[in-house]
A protein has these predicted regions:
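Structured non-transmembrane domains adjacent to transmembrane bundles in polytopic membrane proteins
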Residues: 43, 52-74, 82-162, 390-577, ...
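Membrane-embedded transmembrane helical bundles of large multi-pass transporters/channels
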Residues: 1-41, 108, 132-392, 499, ...
Length: 717
């Protein structure tokens, strides 16, 4: 099948490239035609992503009907004296006059707000016409900051803007830097691996092209099917596509280079390359897609969108890797690798005893001491995995770029006002007879709950009362969520007048409900994803023991990754816990990508067994020949995720996935899996056949690489 596909591609490469360009142009044009700048198909409201039966969701629905929020977004101004002294009456008068001085484009209103109990700072709120992450809002925040500086110049007052719109404005520049850094890392690593500027630049261009196709397709899908993309999906999608797309290109280009070195012409070399890697890469992509697709079983809406979106994107990327990439590189031939010389590094060598490089050294170690390698690898990964015993989840999603104005202003606010000022908990009281008197009496009872630092106001409209409460703890902290579930909700329901109903909502209550749902999701998604991956492995490898072994290996890799993350962020970094999404995201990435790389190594190992090698020889040869391509792909993918460490909201996910990919690459694919295969031998592939059809006695010296080889014999460059 892949030979037929490759032959068709290299015969008409221009048509293949034109078809992809046509698809890109059509989807991009359609996306712009339906694009809604207000971001109605993008949301970060977690209440939108929970099942309807949860109390926080019901509270949000009641609030949106009875007390609809104005369109757009908001930013909060924090004003204080430069000398830290309490605000004077003259200072207060200047702040009262700010609304007239801050009427800039994109801002609908500015309203003076609360004064801190110690009188040292005061708030003001600006309403913006656009959504927080819209370009017009980012520009409006910039104008607000300039106007504020002008208005307070020489007054002895200093101010900073924070809140959702200001945080988005500060994060937008960092996002550009992160994505630019990611592309730079990939460019540099491709240059190191292939020593070809053409490959580095062209590969990045092709991957970005396919990424645009995927993004446009998902955007159009949102318009047709009504799903919404949150910031996690939008942040992860380009990272995944850049990393995985580069992976597939590396596998193709390694094999293509080997055949060009062997003397094949550019078309024959590409047909050979695609026919040999096509099956393994396709199955690997299916494993990744199935792992991501398992998120459909989650009851959290953001995961239900994230998983299928990534699955579709990965399948598009593998389609490009088998059509678009071969078409482009078959046209270039040897010129793609310029200025590197395509000389076979193994030419004239009759044995691999003198082979150098990490892969060759690892191969010799596995051939001589497979049991030692297996035990040592399991021990190291097991020790790292012990960190999972101390894992705690964190729901603190309000991380702002360190050193930014929004982060500094938030620190000022928290020093003088309750921690929950920017994210009040909202309690709704509904039913006949609900009036202001009943609502205020109800609010007084709620204010006695220990977690409540201060009431935030009472409103009554159409038989619905809204009571805002400012919590004493940070709204996304575990203490706040525990208190809302264990103290505030029971008290609110008990204090409700007869015949009325109570709904506790707000961000803290929403994340308390998410915590409950997520715990149940983890117990469902983990085993289902593992089972589906195991089934795919069994169908592809046709070996029971090897399939079970690969699953066990990637599970150990996941535990080691999560344990390392606990060590880095909780123990060394002093953070309260790991992002609540991290275990599920890391499990899927490490399991899928770890399996992906292992498939390539195991496929090569099985071919070496069929060529007549002993299990130890086959394991060593698989590492020596497949190891460099896997290492190059793993390092590039880890590098692309590692850049996310610069993002305050994605740092944990970025580092964890990068560590997990490196563990999967070197700990599993280079060491543990080949060592276990060397120990178990041909029995690992039962009931599939692995013996040479000719019945030849296994050779003690090296044999020519079989034609079915997955990746070339290279040393890491």
């Amino acid at each position: 099948m892949f030979t037929t596909l490759a032959t068709a591609v290299v015969r008409r490469p221009g048509r293949v490239i034109a078809a992809w360009l046509l698809v890109l142009a059509a989807l991009t044009a359609a996306t712009f035609a339906v694009y809604e700048p207000e971001g109605s198909r993008s949301t970060d409201s977690q209440a939108d992503f929970l099942p309807d039966r949860y109390e926080s969701v019901k509270a949000a629905e009641i609030g949106s009907r009875a007390f609809p929020d104005p369109d757009g977004s908001s930013a909060v101004l924090v004003v204080r004296r430069a000398d830290g002294a309490p605000l004077t009456s003259a200072d207060q008068a200047r702040i009262d006059g700010l609304p007239q001085q801050l009427q800039v484009a994109g801002v609908t209103s500015v309203t003076p707000g609360a004064v801190a109990p110690d009188g040292r700072l005061r708030l003001a709120e600006a309403r913006l016409a656009g959504e927080a992450d819209a370009e017009e809002s980012i520009d409006a925040v910039g104008r607000l900051r300039d106007a504020t500086d002008d208005a307070l110049a020489g007054t002895g007052l200093v101010a900073g803007w924070t809140g959702e719109a200001a945080g988005a404005a500060d994060g937008s520049l960092l996002d550009l830097i992160v994505h630019g850094g990611m592309m730079l890392v990939i460019l540099v690593l491709l240059l190191v691996v292939f020593r070809s500027p053409a490959i580095a630049l062209l590969n990045l261009l092709l991957v970005l092209m396919v990424s645009q196709v995927a993004t446009s397709l998902l955007t159009l899908g949102g318009e047709v099917f009504g799903y919404e993309l949150d910031s996690s999906t939008k942040n992860l999608l380009p990272v995944v596509l850049l990393g995985i797309g580069t992976d597939y290109a590396v596998f193709l280009l390694f094999r293509y280079r080997e055949r060009l070195r062997a003397g094949d012409d550019r078309r024959a070399a590409m047909v050979h390359a695609v026919s040999r890697i096509g099956g393994a890469v396709t199955v690997s992509a299916l494993v990744v897609a199935v792992a991501f697709g398992a998120l459909l079983l989650s009851r959290i809406g953001s995961f239900q969108v994230l998983g299928p979106a990534l699955a579709v994107a990965v399948l598009l990327m593998v389609a490009a890797a088998l059509t678009l990439f071969p078409a482009v590189y078959s046209l270039l031939g040897r010129r793609a690798y310029w200025p590197a010389k395509l000389v076979d590094p193994s030419a004239g060598r009759t044995d691999d005893a003198g082979a150098t490089g990490p892969a060759a050294r690892a191969a010799r170690l596995i051939a001589r001491r497979p049991a030692l390698v297996a035990v040592a690898t399991v021990a190291v990964l097991g020790l790292l995995g012990l960190g999972t015993l101390h894992h705690r989840s964190s729901y603190e999603i309000d991380r702002l770029p360190p050193g930014s104005e929004s982060a500094e202003a938030l620190d000022w606010l928290r020093s003088g006002l309750p921690a929950g000022t920017l994210s009040p908990t909202v309690v709704y009281l509904t039913g006949p007879g609900v009036d202001r008197v009943a609502a205020e009496r109800f609010a007084e009872r709620l204010a006695e709950v220990p977690i409540v630092a201060a009431p935030g106001g009472v409103e009554v409209e159409g038989g619905v009362a809204q009571v805002q409460l400012l919590l004493a703890e940070a709204p996304y902290s575990q203490r706040a969520m525990d208190a809302v579930k264990g103290q505030l909700r029971p008290t609110a329901h008990a204090a409700a007048p007869p015949g009325t109903r109570v709904y506790v909502g707000g961000e803290t209550a929403t994340y308390a409900d998410i915590q409950t749902v997520l715990d149940e999701d983890l117990r469902l998604v983990f085993p289902v994803a593992a089972g589906l991956i195991g089934l795919l492995l069994l169908l592809m490898l046709r070996g029971l023991l090897v399939s079970i072994g690969l699953l066990a290996a990637v599970a150990l890799g996941f535990a080691a990754t999560l344990g390392t993350s606990v060590l880095v962020f909780q123990v060394l970094g002093g953070q309260s816990g790991l992002n609540f999404q991290l275990p599920l995201v890391v499990f899927l990435f490490v399991t899928a990508i770890g399996t992906d790389y292992n498939i390539l190594v195991v496929a090569r190992l099985r071919e070496e067994l069929r060529a007549g090698r002993t299990p130890r020889q086959a394991a060593a040869e698989a590492v020596r020949r497949a190891g460099p391509a896997v290492a190059a792909a793993g390092v590039i993918l880890a590098g692309s995720f590692g850049v996310l460490v610069a993002s305050p909201t994605m740092a944990q996910v970025g580092l964890a996935v990068a560590v997990g990919v490196l563990i999967a690459t070197f700990g599993l694919s280079w060491l543990l899996v080949p060592a276990l295969a060397a120990l178990t031998g041909r029995a690992a592939f039962w009931p599939a056949r692995t013996r040479s059809r000719s019945g030849a006695v296994p050779k003690t010296g090296p044999v020519p690489a079989p034609s079915e080889a997955v990746v070339p014999a290279e040393t890491m460059v």
